[in-house]
Amino acid sequence: MANSVTPLFDIGANLLDSQLSKNFNEVITRSKENNIRKIIITSSHIDDTYQAKELIDREPDLLYTTVGFHPHNAKDFKDSHIDKMLELCEHDYVKAIGECGLDYKRNYSSKKDQINCFTKHLELATSIDLPMFLHERDAQNDFIILLKEYSHLVEDIVVHCFTSDKKSLSSYLDLGCYIGITGWITDPNRGYHLHDLISYVPSDKLMIETDSPYLMPFNYPIKNKRYNEPSNLIYILDAIANILKKDKNILAEEIYNNSCRFFNI
């Protein structure tokens, strides 16, 4: 297994997924072996934040989480959730508002519900000192309209699992957003366009994430592994370092510092 001399920070892992949670001890052991020092457990529903706390209690120096409603779950969001979210935001283990945003690719929630839910999250973020962990898929126009209205009022923003085009990237960077890159960049078909785009991301705005158990890096040496996990973050780092022709440990240090600064850790 590859190793990193420099500490690594996985800004987005779905550790509540049964593929990872049922093997939690092994997943954490492998993460530490690959020098993963910090992991953000992605919450896609307020219930996830409560469940994540149970895992965080087992690894309080390694794990943190977010609070929010994924656009797929926007139909479940109610205004009454805001007070509960505010209470959760008072805890040190909650490091961002999200995962929230817009996803028009599948529309598990209506566009109306998604826009309402996302707007409420943006309004919440203007009242507290936490950054936002955002999701966008096939919804660039509405997403950017809302970001332009609120981005100057919130602490910080990361567009997680960026897979879009140069126009969207430019819009996000113009608004001061951080960019989260996953194993998508290693996909020779779907992700090849990112090889060019990543050179436009300023070094102080780049972060990396596994989005595990999804998006297994294509440069992972063992084929047919059933699920991705945080320990594989090193393969995303390797790919980016090769694309940018940059020393891996220097790149890792920059990304780690960006992530700690963003999440105030």
Each language-model region and where it sits:
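Mid-domain alpha/beta scaffold segments of enzyme catalytic cores
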Residues: M1-I265
